[in-house]
């Protein structure tokens, strides 16, 4: 019990923002959901808030699936709005997810991982990762969730800690986590990460974070911690849901991509409503 309490204290310390950095401001948390192409809505909301002069400063930003792709730009602020807009309305998806991105034969996904990488890599460069590291040093936190298929559990990545490593390897891992969080099962193969435990190296298969966590505010253990309110005062939580929560009846085409997307979309609608 004492070890668990110490672990929660440490996690809260990592997520708590130093008073000097946020004195006089509310402790705002932004949770961005999945939603595939609906991410264009979330991007538009953020840009619209900027133009209206109503965009809050966020101490913590979390993202899942397409929300994970938006999260770094939401985290870094309005200066990155142009890149965020280009990522979602610049027509890049049509090129990356065309016939050239299809997987040959019996692959674990309809599209190859490289198709998703082509969408993400141009917008997530060393400059962006360095900017995330700078904000992390100020005490702000950027968190992204994937789903570990092997353990059947969500995995929360502290992207600022990754960014702090600096260099090419940090940028590559940063990109890999975003690719994994957006790897919709059936459409894209799982992304494999090499990890080490007790001196033994092995691989974990990670897919879309929305499989286990349609959205999240912070790691679940912290949400249920009785001392959380005292550690994080003056908090507001903003939730950006990148889909319509009401059912949208229509005829589903009887082909693999249409059935996969429709099934996953239905599952997510229900899980979003339950999460909210």
Model-found features: residue ranges?
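Active-site loop->helix "elbow" adjoining a glycine-rich segment at hydrolase catalytic centers
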Residues: 37, 65-66
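Patatin-like phospholipase
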Residues: 1-60, 75-276
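Hydrolases whose catalytic domains are alpha/beta-hydrolase-1, hotdog thioesterase
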Residues: 70-73
């Amino acid at each position: 019990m004492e070890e668990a309490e110490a672990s929660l204290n440490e996690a809260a310390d990592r997520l708590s923002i130093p008073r000097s950095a946020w004195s006089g401001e509310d402790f705002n948390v932004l949770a961005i959901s999945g939603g595939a192409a609906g991410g264009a809505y979330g991007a538009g909301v953020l840009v619209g808030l900027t133009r209206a002069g109503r965009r809050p400063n966020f101490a913590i930003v979390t993202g899942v699936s397409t929300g994970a792709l938006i999260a770094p730009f939401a985290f870094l602020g309005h200066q990155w709005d142009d890149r965020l807009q280009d990522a979602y309305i610049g027509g890049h998806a049509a090129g990356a997810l065309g016939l050239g991105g299809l997987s040959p034969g019996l692959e674990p996904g309809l599209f190859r991982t490289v198709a998703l990488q082509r969408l993400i890599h141009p917008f997530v460069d060393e400059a962006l990762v360095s900017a995330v590291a700078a904000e992390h040093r100020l005490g702000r936190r950027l968190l992204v969730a994937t789903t570990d298929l092997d353990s059947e559990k969500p995995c929360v990545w502290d992207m600022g800690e990754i960014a702090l490593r600096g260099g090419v390897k940090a940028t590559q891992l940063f990109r890999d986590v975003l690719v994994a969080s957006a790897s919709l099962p059936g459409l894209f193969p799982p992304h494999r990460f090499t990890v080490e435990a007790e001196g033994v190296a092995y691989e974990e298969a990670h897919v879309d974070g929305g499989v286990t966590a349609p959205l999240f505010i912070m790691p679940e253990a912290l949400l249920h911690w009785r001392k959380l309110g005292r550690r994080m005062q003056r908090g507001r939580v903003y939730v950006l849901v990148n889909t319509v929560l009401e059912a949208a009846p229509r005829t589903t085409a009887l082909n693999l991509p249409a059935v996969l997307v429709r099934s996953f979309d239905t599952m997510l609608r229900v899980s979003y409503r339950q999460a909210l």
